[in-house]
């Protein structure tokens, strides 16, 4: 069990806001002619560019939040672990750490170490709008 707070990151590699958005993803997709890792299927790109995020966008920012940073301690094997808020609500899935977190198995530094989680609303959006998995969406009550 690990606990922490969602927050920005400022370290040797610069400053990062605590969440990423669809425009930041589309900016990377725009570079896909130079960087293969940024390529997406044309239908996925069209879906993202459409910008109809409905119930999945963040109520405060109005943005589709994709991933977020926390100061949770994460280690190998944690990928896919659920991330809950203080109310016990699922908010995301842990999947990685920032570069400065790579040494956290030896020395955890709360100021530099960040866990990267995918926002569960983005996961549900992809399941719903791209995967058309209506039965799954109904099963989780959306």
Where are these regions (language model features)?
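Serine endopeptidase catalytic core focused on the charge-relay Asp
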Residues: 1-77, 84-142
